[in-house]
Amino acid sequence: MISVCPQNDLQKCYRSLTFDVPGQQFEERNEQNLKKRAKKKGSFQPSVAFDTVPSTAGYSSIDDSREGFKGVPVPNYYTMEECYDDETDSFSPNLQYYLRDTFQSSPFLNTRKENKSESSSFPMRSSKLLEKNSDIKKYFLVSKNGKIVRRDYPSTPVIVNETLMINRFEKNWIKLWRQRKLQINERLNDKKKWFTYPELIFSEERIKPLYRGDDSAPCTKEQKRKHKILQQKVGYPNNPKTIVCHINGKKHTWVALDWTVYKFARNLDHIVVITTLPKMISNRKKTAKDDTEWAPGYQKEVIDQKLNDIFDYILQLVKVVKISVKITLEIIVGKIKKSLVDVINVHTPDFLVLATLKHERNENLITYKSKKLTDVFPVSYPIPTFVVPSKRMYSFELNLQREVNEHYVSKNHMKHEHTDVESMSSSMFKKNTISDISSHISVDSYAEDFKRQGYIKKQFNTSNDSIPRKLTGLAQHSRRKITGDIEKLQDDEKDRECTKEKLLLKKIDIIIRESLKSSLAIETLPGKNVSQSSHGDQISSFKNALIGNGSKNTKFRKSLIPYSSSEEQNTTTTIKLSSSPTSQIKFATSVKHKDGRAALGKARNLPDIRHSISFDKENSFDPSDKSSSVDNSIPLRKVKSAGALRKVKTNDSSSSAGSKKSSSSFSTVNTFTGGGVGIFKVFKSGSSSGNKSSSRRNSSSGDVFESDDRNDKKKKKKKKKKSLFLFGKI
């Protein structure tokens, strides 16, 4: 399969491709022979370049080539108003000519032509008129037959570069393109017949008329007409599909040209192939021998020869594909990016085809924020770009070589029936070997990856029982089985009566069943004679090869983790819990860790977190909760203020059922524990000695609080009334 390929290198097979084209006799490289060779191109004929015909004219010069250009009528005489008129918006025939690019004769000019006396006495010309006449001499040329021809296209060169080019088209291309244009025009005339929603596709836009200019002055007819022309949308020109392909001296770029001509191009397409040459600077002065130089350092004859060689190569491919296309070849002196930008501005292509050497399975063909040619154009330019990976196209290149050789072998066999038997046998042997290669190798093959990782050696002496071979064999067997079962399902008469949904379900069952069988076969892959250790090593190396971690110089390993066989053995991993993070809040040394939130001081506006957490406990109506709500074994902290003695509450004390303070304006209401707090204390009896003793059991300052309450009963009553008005702050 792979040993047939020269040097066992599929990735670089594009370098050694050869087309067995019948040889041509040697000719001297002069201009006459090059012209004769251009005429002998067979079905291709020369055509005009882009700088002689506007690209939006639809190749009208080809259509009207027999009729010829009729010339532009220019008036022989000027009126007095035209000579001394300084207003740019005045209505005159010459002004109409410059605005519309056409000349409209007026009736009073005919009277001027008849009167010879007035024509002889021409008035004095101003400086502006002299400049106008000098410009007219640049734009018009009087031919030999007396016709006045314009030579001001392009009026100002948009693109200035040193380029040699060839434009040729197939002999049937013009005929087919005319038919295509007629078909398009017919469909545009009868839109309702060919389009479902013509109102949406060809919507007519209304142009707002211009009545006044920027200076609020009324606009003239010429200004209104200009505004209407500029605001009207013309749309895209009716041109064929244009494909631009870039090649250079590197062989991998020619794979893009092969793919463009052989796979991508269709009838009536315009293929533009460009290549660039570096600009050379010569310090020496020009001599008589340098007259034939096209650019500094390049002879025109050599460039013409190279253009013809490239065209010959494309011609061999077109003959095999048998398509009618137009081909443009350009050799530009300058930088690649600037040359491509110029070509895009000139030809306005629909597609751009480039080649790259990137071929890894886990590698992106396009990289953002890169300065390479294949990365800049797909990202920065609004043109659909095809990037052809040359090293992955070995199957395509081998098939192309086989078909081109078969085409010319069959031609030679028809012309020369009495050829040698040995030459025919050798050609047939080459054909068979190449067909064997192309039939076994697919685009999704991993043969090049195995070779790069060392699985396929140059001698190709690996055993047939290797894991890569078994995997590929299992995959091919499962695919054949699935396709065969689906074909049988479609041919079965009983299944024809089933609905589409049932047929789809049966197909899904076939795919699932065969995929499960293949997965089970992969699990039992090594067999009886292979040891488990060697099998594990082979599997691990194979997995590393698939994800690109086998070689030393591999890149793009951002999201891929290398595989090792030891990972399967240690499936259970122990997770060490880290120590709890230390609190960043520091308290005094006398503060205990069980004091809760009260250790932070007064917190009137803060919500009570403990009530929200222990809601289920407080919701239970267990009588034991009322008596023993506080742990008596843990003594409470004694707090004494420096100024006036006042009560400081903790979380444990505030949540107890026995603590019922009448002067608490910030405590919450708990209806489930049975004790009234806050506002509801007003409606209860003021004497509750048992509760007082239970709440102050462990406090040494209880007597002080009792004496304070007896002496200030009036103040207490006032505070109770305030709690009613402070209900919104609770």
UniProtKB/Swiss-Prot annotation:
Top-rank taxon: Eukaryota
UniProt keyword terms in alphabetical order: Cell cycle
Region (Disordered): 615-667, 684-730
Biased composition (Low complexity): 653-667, 684-701
Feature: compositional bias, Basic residues: 713-723
GO biological process, one term: autophagy of mitochondrion
Biased composition (Basic and acidic residues): 615-625
Protein name (record): Uncharacterized protein YOR019W
Gene source species: Saccharomyces cerevisiae (strain ATCC 204508 / S288c)
